[in-house]
């Protein structure tokens, strides 16, 4: 036998198969982690925006409805620091039939056209939080 060094094709294929198997096992956990982290980011943005709404209420005795296109107070309408990296678009509206003097509801919509449109949250979907403390969905994992 001569002094050849290197790997045979069979050895390379075995290593490649092992790497693919490990990646296939790790990918679902990684994807679930990304969704959870984006959800936490959205919840944090909702809480921060609600605090801004409460400050506005203390000055004006009413809350402010806003959206990405209509935002006179420049409240945060996206979940991350940069809209292009955000997973949720945030807006505010009156709660049901109540006026803005009584209640405001913040809505975080995942994967809209103004933010990362590829993002989906199959467990929680759209998150809502109102000034009376009611939030939906009520699933505990959505608010952790």
Predicted regions and their residues:
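N-terminal single-pass transmembrane signal-anchor helix
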Residues: 1-33
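Aromatic side chains
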Residues: 7, 30-33, 57, 63, ...
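Residues at secondary-structure transition points
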Residues: 4, 33-40, 44, 99, ...
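Membrane-proximal N-terminal amphipathic helix
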Residues: 35-62
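Periplasmic/extracellular, small/polar-rich flexible segments of pilin-like filament-forming proteins
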Residues: 59-144
């Amino acid at each position: 036998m001569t002094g050849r060094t290197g790997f045979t094709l069979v050895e390379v294929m075995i290593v490649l198969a092992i790497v693919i198997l490990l990646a296939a096992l790790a990918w679902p956990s990684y994807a679930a982690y990304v969704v959870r982290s984006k959800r936490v980011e959205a919840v944090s943005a909702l809480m921060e925006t609600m605090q801004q709404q409460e400050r506005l209420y203390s000055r004006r005795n009413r809350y402010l409805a806003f959206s990405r296109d209509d935002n006179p107070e420049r409240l945060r309408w996206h979940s991350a620091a940069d809209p292009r990296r955000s997973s949720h678009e945030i807006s505010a509206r009156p709660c049901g039939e109540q006026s803005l003097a009584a209640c405001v509801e913040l809505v975080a919509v995942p994967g809209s056209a103004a933010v990362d449109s590829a993002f989906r949250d199959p467990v929680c979907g759209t998150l809502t939080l109102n000034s009376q403390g009611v939030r939906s969905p009520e699933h505990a994992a959505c608010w952790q």
